[in-house]
């Protein structure tokens, strides 16, 4: 007989357990049977929730499905008992069911989640995009009106980029101010020492060289520069200072 005629109903689904499927009358009718030999093999499948909580590996189970072979009449017939046992032993030793049980557990968990949340018509990608955590984009510090200025990169002969180092040269204004202060202090100290040695009174008056100097900048803005120089009023004091600087003392 064919398998379609021997198909059995699924039975009742109770306490979240899969019904027991009975493989009956599959063997060929022409095959002789001994007295007391039962051809009905009952296969007990675990429940879905037990697979979700802790996946069991079917390595130590003895009730495995009976392997079927195609007979000459078009139906399915069971092989001999020795060949069936050999096939079962080789399958259990060669195949590892841990990876398959893990995949089945994940698929069952996902199907159970879709059933509970009533989202059976959606795919995994839709649910993933819905529950994915979106990180906020980095806000630019500069405004849109101001252009973003970036430092230029210098290209070497080998084609690599080199960022230009920051200039450590001081501006002329800072150099002039620093030199003026240092020269003024040194000049004043030397003038005081020379005045004590030469017994000459050097006045501390300030004689302006140029009161107002109007120069035009590149931006056409007039700037007024005030320059002042401290010079002694006595010619003898100036000569003594020149002699002091030129001497080896």
From Swiss-Prot:
Negative regulatory component of the MBF complex involved in cell-cycle-dependent transcription. It is found in: Cytoplasm; Nucleus. Keywords: Cytoplasm, Nucleus, Phosphoprotein, Repressor, Transcription, Transcription regulation. GO terms for cellular component: cytoplasm; MBF transcription complex; nucleus. The modification Phosphoserine is found at residue 145. One of its GO terms (molecular function) is DNA-binding transcription factor binding. It comes from the Eukaryota. Belongs to the WHI5/NRM1 family. Pfam families: Whi5. Residues 208-230 are annotated as: Disordered. GO terms for biological process: G1/S transition of mitotic cell cycle; negative regulation of transcription by RNA polymerase II. This is Transcription factor NRM1. The MBF complex is composed of at least SWI6, MBP1 and NRM1. Present with 2880 molecules/cell in log phase SD medium. Induction: During G1 phase of the cell cycle.
């Amino acid at each position: 007989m064919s398998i379609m005629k021997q198909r059995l109903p699924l039975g009742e689904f109770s306490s979240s357990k899969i019904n027991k499927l009975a493989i009956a009358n599959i063997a060929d009718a022409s095959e002789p049977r001994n007295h007391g030999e039962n051809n009905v093999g009952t296969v007990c499948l675990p429940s879905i929730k037990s697979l979700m909580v802790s996946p069991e590996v079917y390595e130590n189970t003895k009730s495995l499905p009976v392997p079927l072979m195609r007979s000459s009449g078009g139906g399915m017939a069971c092989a001999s008992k020795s060949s069936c046992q050999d096939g079962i032993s080789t399958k259990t030793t060669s195949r590892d069911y841990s990876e398959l049980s893990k995949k089945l557990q994940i698929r069952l968990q996902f199907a159970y989640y879709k059933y509970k949340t009533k989202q059976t018509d959606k795919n995994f990608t839709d649910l993933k995009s819905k529950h994915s955590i979106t990180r906020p984009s980095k806000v630019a510090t500069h405004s849109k009106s101001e252009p973003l200025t970036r430092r230029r990169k210098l290209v070497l002969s080998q084609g690599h980029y080199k960022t230009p180092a920051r200039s450590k040269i001081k501006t002329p204004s800072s150099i002039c101010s620093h030199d003026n202060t240092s020269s003024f202090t040194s000049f004043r100290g030397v003038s005081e020492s020379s005045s004590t040695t030469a017994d000459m009174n050097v006045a501390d008056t300030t004689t302006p060289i140029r009161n107002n100097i109007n120069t035009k900048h590149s931006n056409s803005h007039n700037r007024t520069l005030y320059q002042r120089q401290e010079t002694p009023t006595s010619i003898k004091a100036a000569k003594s200072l020149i002699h002091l600087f030129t001497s080896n003392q």
